[in-house]
């Protein structure tokens, strides 16, 4: 009898594993197909990824025989179906986002912000406050949500993600300062938005009033201190380990990956949501010091990020339910989207760029481009589900509204950014680009002259000292 029960359990376990394997393999394959489609048609990959996730998730319930999803990301014991038990999906999402943001941090070079550093700082401070207040008020009055739920939604859409900004910048030749502003904002604002969302979430779940507000300020300060301290410390620990040949070349990439995951988890033990800040700081430090084989590390992390982004967006999109979509199927949703894109974002950018030296057309383009990405989607799914289970009124609106903003801004920017760049005059024509081989003194003088006359110049050289001098003159220079 016991042997028969054991065989039955083994058979059920085997069937579950087969389902898990098929669904997971399907997600990976569909994700890579979506990435290829995005490359082929020069659109951000997030767009086809979300559409695929919706198709195998909520939309599939309209045509499956039993009315269930083709892919159910979270295990449902009633349906005997699902990939991740409990909050396993969200733990996976958190770790994956840490790797993605680390890769983004590696690409941030300090020479890029020589002219626009103050603008970036204001965008992630003043711009954040404008978005937080504007989106909070808009969602409250349009959907009659409670103030805490409204401002949780607002905190979640503060972020403009590198997962979306990078493909747009790759496909549109822009002036250096504009690209730098959008790229740095997209990466640095992610941890800020995550921390803001956590503070509002804790306000809803744990405590309210002046006492909690004071505690929230302390927690915010703690998050910043922990994030910077651990990020800097482990960045230099990894740097010296590689520099002293303590890590063999063939293990460098995987050891770096383990550092990223370890730093994220360690940082989270000291301060909630400080992990994202830690990995961004770690990436920034490593990207701006003389780290051997940095390009190889960057290529590895970039490939890994592509895979993780593909999996994440399909899983998170598939996790939405049809009843969530019906909730926001009205004109108020369109009005909210219009407020975020055409009112709140431009106001935030204009206030952040006062006396910045940027031209009006450059400010207009930065205002136009503000797509949301994986951090907004991931945290919205986590907090939305938790608050729904706790019975918080209006919590069911959080996930669909955030996904509406993510999908809407991506679709909007993917289809209009290139055209608006041309209309606003920030688009660099291909014929204006000049490549100079060698970054010697005479080459730098010529390049500077051409740059002042409106030409886009790039210098390449194998000499690191020449490259640094060129970058010090605000020239685009790459190591050969």
Which residues fall in each region the model found?
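Transmembrane helical cores of multi-pass secondary ion antiporters/exchangers
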Residues: 2-433, 456, 461
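Structured cytosolic domains appended to multi-pass membrane proteins
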Residues: 426-480
């Amino acid at each position: 009898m016991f042997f028969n029960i054991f065989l039955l359990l083994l058979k059920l376990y085997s069937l579950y594993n087969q389902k898990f394997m098929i669904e997971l393999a399907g997600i990976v394959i569909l994700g890579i197909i979506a990435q290829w489609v995005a490359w082929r048609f020069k659109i951000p990959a997030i767009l086809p990824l979300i559409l695929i996730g919706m198709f195998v998730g909520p939309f599939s319930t309209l045509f499956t025989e039993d009315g269930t999803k083709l892919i159910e990301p979270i295990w449902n014991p009633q349906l005997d179906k699902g990939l991740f038990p409990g909050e396993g999906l969200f733990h996976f999402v958190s770790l994956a986002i840490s790797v993605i943001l680390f890769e983004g941090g590696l690409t941030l070079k300090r020479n890029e912000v020589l002219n626009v550093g103050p603008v970036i700082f204001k965008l992630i401070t003043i711009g954040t406050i404008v978005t937080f207040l504007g989106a909070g008020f808009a969602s409250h009055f349009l959907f009659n949500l409670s103030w805490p739920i409204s401002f949780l939604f607002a905190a979640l859409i503060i972020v403009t993600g590198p997962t979306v900004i990078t493909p747009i910048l790759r496909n549109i030749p822009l002036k250096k300062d504009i690209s730098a502003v959008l790229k740095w904002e997209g990466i640095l604002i992610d941890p800020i938005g995550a921390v803001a969302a956590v503070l509002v979430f804790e306000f809803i779940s744990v405590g309210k009033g002046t006492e909690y507000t004071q505690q929230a300020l302390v927690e915010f300060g703690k998050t910043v201190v922990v994030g910077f301290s651990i990020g800097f410390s482990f960045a230099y620990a990894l740097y010296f380990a590689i520099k002293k040949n303590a890590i063999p070349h063939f293990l460098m990439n995987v050891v770096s990956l383990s550092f990223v995951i370890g730093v994220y988890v360690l940082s989270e033990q000291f301060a909630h949501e400080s992990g994202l800040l830690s990995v961004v700081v770690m990436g920034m430090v490593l990207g701006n010091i003389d780290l051997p084989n940095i390009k190889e590390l960057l290529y590895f992390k970039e490939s890994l990020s592509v895979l993780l982004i593909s999996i994440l967006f399909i899983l998170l999109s598939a996790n939405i339910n049809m009843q969530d979509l019906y909730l926001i199927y009205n004109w108020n949703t369109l009005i909210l989207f219009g407020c975020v894109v055409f009112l709140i974002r431009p106001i935030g950018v204009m206030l952040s760029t006062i006396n910045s030296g940027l031209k009006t057309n450059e400010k207009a383009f930065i205002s136009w481009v503000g797509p949301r990405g994986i951090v907004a989607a991931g945290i919205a799914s986590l907090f939305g589900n938790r608050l729904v289970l706790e019975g918080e009124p209006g919590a069911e609106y959080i996930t669909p509204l955030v996904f509406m903003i993510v999908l809407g801004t991506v679709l909007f920017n993917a289809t209009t950014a290139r055209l608006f760049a041309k209309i606003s005059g920030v688009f660099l024509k291909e014929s204006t680009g000049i490549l100079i081989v060698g970054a010697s003194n005479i080459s730098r003088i010529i390049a500077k002259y051409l740059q002042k006359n409106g030409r886009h110049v790039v210098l390449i050289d194998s000499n690191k000292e020449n490259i640094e001098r060129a970058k010090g003159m605000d020239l685009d220079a790459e190591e050969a």
